[in-house]
């Protein structure tokens, strides 16, 4: 299920555009996640008071967390599938502390694709979308495998 060198290049090309505004992209991804899948908000105690999209847009904490999420994802993507060292602590915290189900990682992956399509349509055509989908699926599968090792049924 690995990606070719060309596919990784497509992923990293668009990711360079994300890195130019990690906070803005991250905020948009989290708002999209919470609007599309409101049940995911239950996993974020510090965001439970954010009832409207306006509240979410005004939250510096949400913007910061979005930046954190996409920074971590970018570090993993740049490893081009050789990300075991980066996945381990992420899986550990998301399984044991945050209890984030793999399904929620699928949800956020879908939102990431949508945000990239909207913000970078010229650089995120069908080939790049397919490559990013594969990269995010690889990430989720590896997280799910670590979850299983940790005994988390998420």
Swiss-Prot record:
Principal location class: cytoplasm
Record keywords, A-Z: Cytoplasm, Heme, Iron, Metal-binding, Muscle protein, Oxidoreductase, Oxygen transport, Phosphoprotein, Transport
Sequence positions bearing Phosphoserine: 4, 121
Domain of life: Eukaryota
Pfam families given in the database record: Globin
All residue ranges annotated as the Globin domain in the record: 2-148
Reactions mediated catalytically: Fe(III)-heme b-[protein] + nitric oxide + H2O = Fe(II)-heme b-[protein] + nitrite + 2 H(+); H2O2 + AH2 = A + 2 H2O
Compartments in which it is found: Cytoplasm, Sarcoplasm
GO molecular function: heme binding; metal ion binding; nitrite reductase activity; oxygen binding; oxygen carrier activity; peroxidase activity
Gene3D superfamilies (UniProt xref): 6.10.140.2100, 6.10.140.2110
Membrane spanning stretches: none
Record GO biological process: brown fat cell differentiation; enucleate erythrocyte differentiation; heart development; removal of superoxide radicals; response to hormone; response to hydrogen peroxide; response to hypoxia; slow-twitch skeletal muscle fiber contraction
Annotated heme b binding sites: 94
UniProt: O2 binding residues: 65
Modified residues (Phosphothreonine): 68, 75
Protein name listed in UniProt: Myoglobin
Species the sequence originates in: Mus musculus (Mouse)
């Amino acid at each position: 299920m690995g990606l070719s060198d060309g596919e990784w290049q497509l992923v990293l090309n668009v990711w360079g555009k994300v890195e130019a505004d990690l906070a803005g992209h991250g905020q948009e991804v989290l708002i999209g996640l919470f609007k599309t899948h409101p049940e995911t908000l239950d996993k974020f105690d510090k965001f439970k008071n954010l009832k409207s999209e306006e509240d979410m847009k005004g939250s510096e904490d949400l913007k910061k967390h979005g930046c954190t999420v996409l920074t971590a994802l970018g570090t993993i993507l740049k490893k081009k599938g050789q990300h075991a060292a980066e996945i381990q602590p992420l899986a550990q915290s998301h399984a044991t502390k945050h209890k984030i189900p793999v399904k929620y990682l699928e949800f956020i992956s879908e939102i990431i694709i949508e945000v990239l399509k909207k913000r970078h349509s010229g650089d995120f055509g069908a080939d790049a979308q397919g490559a990013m989908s594969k990269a995010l699926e690889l990430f989720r599968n590896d997280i799910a495998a670590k979850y299983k090792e940790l005994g988390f049924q998420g």
